[in-house]
Amino acid sequence: MAQIWEYIKIALMNIKSNKGRSVLTMLGIIIGIASVIMVIAIGNGVRGQVNDELEGLAGGQIAFYVDSTRKETTVTFDQTDFDAIEANIAHVKGVTPQLSAWGTAEGPKGNFDISMTGGDPGLQYTSSEPIVKGRYFSQDDCDAGGNVCVITESSAVSLFGTTDVIGLTFEATFWGVTQEMRVIGVRKDTASSLISMAGGGTEIITAECPLSFMGNKLYYDIDDFSEFYVIADNSAYCTQVAQDALNLLEARHGVRGENQIMMQSLSLIHISEPTRRT
């Protein structure tokens, strides 16, 4: 015990005689511990932020597709599959395939490249950005195959110089086919598009339209698809919706257990806390 006290006295004497070095040592220890705490806190915050962003971008989305690399694959999807899922699976907000087309658009403010995405009304829910003016296209619009579209705020400004564009028209040309498009809705810009514009990126018109328009007016094949999306009411239902929809599809196509139909629940892509070794 006496020896321990002797060690303590020597330590205290060394601290007193080397105050500067002792303070720096203590400061280094404090900074080191604080840095570890900060890194852990930032890691947790970034992980949470990334997960929130993923939830916002793909919350509730489930992709169904076929493995096209397999020679024995016989499955394709059509409108009857989409209707069956909406009619028979609970907690489904929307079902839609997607077709994309690149072309040119001409409005009062000039000519631009345009990226057009066609789908069913459920296409609205594949993006988290809200409709800020007008409305999204409805099933009636799809049944009519009308020349209607929803564009982004930046696209509206590029084409017309304003976001007050509901009812206005512009010309869009795809593969030599020109159609007059009527704007019925405006969607809020994505963060990535705003960053691109701020950085001087090329202005591209972004539009969404009924799939039937692309088939009837642009002559795209809209009868069969190799992939489509199901959007659940909430990401909490994704697992159940995905399994129920897969069971339904396999039964409809007679391929149960053959792994011809694949799925990926985009809401289940999360950054987890690293596993610690014990």
Please place each PLM-identified region on the residue numbering.
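N-terminal Sec/SRP start-transfer signal
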Residues: 1-31
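Membrane-interface segments of envelope glycosyltransferases acting on lipid-linked substrates or membrane lipids
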Residues: 4-5, 85, 205, 214
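Short, strongly hydrophobic transmembrane alpha-helices
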Residues: 20-48
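Hydrophobic, regular-secondary-structure patches
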Residues: 43-115, 122-125, 215-218, 236-240, ...
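Hydrophobic secondary-structure segments that place a key small or acidic residue at a functional site
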Residues: 98-99, 109-217
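"Rare, low-scoring activations can occur
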Residues: 187-190, 200-265
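Single conserved hydrophobic/aromatic residue that forms the stacking wall/gate
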Residues: 269-278
